[in-house]
A protein has these predicted regions:
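Conserved lysine of the Walker
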Residues: 17
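P-loop (Walker A) phosphate-binding loop of NTP-binding proteins
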Residues: 12
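Phosphate-binding P-loop
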Residues: 1-4
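ATP-dependent small-molecule kinase phosphotransfer cores
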Residues: 31-103
Length: 212
């Protein structure tokens, strides 16, 4: 049984998810994980080069399964922050594959050892802000057809809502449209403190915005 909180950060590309996830993990000494295990990073470009949504769906599903085992071990020693998890995989690929993937999601849930987080932090921003942020960073990092492009061309927010409806865990939505990282972090701490009253594993954590 895990001893520490497991927090997943989800959201559209360009919403500020990674910035907020890294800040939260640093301030609270949680272990921070990206979605892809080190062992699979070397084949990501090959998978992306297929331009096959089925291929990327199975690739990220494998990433989730491998990370799940890592999280289960790490949660004995510290809190875990996951920068994307199964929710992204299903929200994005439901759109790319134009299929209802809820059956596959429930199949994962049926695996007794598969971990769901204690809380999901869903980071959003207005579409114009997201478009501008993606445009700014695309000058240095190419737009991914299975990531940034999906955020630009599809209604990913609605897809996320359909996936979130499949689980019974707190979903905290943090809108960064008019917030800098520190402001968003302060709002997040307030929301986490609020739900800690009904989420026992969070009660031992000091969710103060002043944490250094």
């Amino acid at each position: 049984m895990k001893q520490f909180p497991f927090v997943v950060f989800e959201g559209l590309d360009g919403a500020g998810k990674t910035t907020l996830a890294e800040l939260f993990a640093k301030r609270h000494s949680f272990s921070y994980y990206t979605s892809i295990p080190p062992e699979l990073i070397s084949i990501r470009k090959q998978i992306a080069a297929t331009h096959s949504p089925i291929s990327t769906f199975h690739f990220y599903s494998l990433c989730n399964i491998m990370r799940n085992h890592e999280y289960a071990l790490q949660l004995n020693d510290s809190g875990v922050v996951a920068d994307r998890y199964i929710f992204s995989t299903f929200a994005y690929h439901s759109l790319l594959m134009q299929q209802d993937l809820s059956y596959h999601f429930r199949l994962l849930q049926s695996e007794q050892k598969f971990l769901l987080p204690d809380v999901v932090v869903y980071v959003t921003a207005s579409q114009p802000v997201i478009n501008q942020r993606i445009a700014n960073r695309s000058q240095e990092v190419p737009i991914q057809w299975y990531g940034d492009k999906v955020s630009l061309e599809y209604n990913v927010s609605e897809s996320y809502k359909r996936i979130f409806a499949l689980v019974d865990i707190p979903i905290l939505q943090i809108d960064t449209t008019n917030s800098d990282p520190e402001q968003a972090y302060s709002i997040l701490c307030h929301e986490l403190d609020r739900i800690s009253k009904t989420t026992p594993v969070l009660r031992s954590i000091e969710f103060s915005a002043s944490t250094n």
